[in-house]
A protein has these predicted regions:
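Flexible, charged surface loops at secondary-structure boundaries
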Residues: 1-2, 57-60, 110-113, 129
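Classical N-terminal secretory signal peptides
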Residues: 1-4, 159
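Alpha-helical substrate-recognition element adjacent to the catalytic core
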Residues: 3-96
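C-terminal cap/substrate-recognition subdomain and adjoining C-terminal extension
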Residues: 75-159
Length: 159
């Protein structure tokens, strides 16, 4: 059976502006905030968004491919996977934004057999080539509604 792929951006998907504002206020008040997981003292994810992502992977068996700047060549994919409690199967060549990211995803799909895929990325520019397979959290990051759409697409139940 051909694998399905979830192309994962992190910033804007597993965190968003309002999350960073809330985290910043917690840090100013020197309070820990269990709503967030901090990666190497600078980056973070929102725990409820991370749980939604983990459920997508569990329910679909998809392989996670990094497209975020978190996956640049200087960072260890296994370490990021451990932090997210997910297996990261790889990353595209260009983990910066813009058309380079889009072209890297297209190249990956051309070079790897697949049944279904989802591009989970808040970047709008260029990703229109993926049609319905581009799930674009706009302001709130990953939501339950977007999670269900990802699951349906990855299972081939939404075309």
């Amino acid at each position: 059976m051909k694998p399905s792929y979830l192309f994962l951006d992190i910033d804007g998907v597993l965190n968003c502006y309002s999350d960073s504002e809330q985290l910043f206020l917690s840090e100013i008040e020197k309070k820990s905030n269990p709503s967030f997981k901090i990666y190497k003292s600078a980056d973070f994810v929102c725990c409820n968004k991370l749980r939604l992502l983990q459920e997508i992977v569990t329910q679909t068996g998809c392989q996670v491919i990094g497209i975020s700047s978190w996956f640049n060549s200087k960072r260890d994919q296994k370490d990021i996977g451990k932090f997210l409690d997910l297996k990261i199967s790889g990353a595209v060549e260009c983990t910066g934004g813009g058309t380079g990211r889009t072209k890297s995803i297209q190249k990956f799909l051309e070079q790897n057999e697949h049944s279904n895929f989802v591009v989970l990325d808040d970047q709008q520019v260029g990703h229109d080539v993926f049609g319905e397979n581009h799930i674009c959290p706009q302001r709130e990051g990953l939501t339950k509604e977007l999670q269900l759409k990802c699951i349906d697409l990855l299972k081939g139940e939404l075309k």
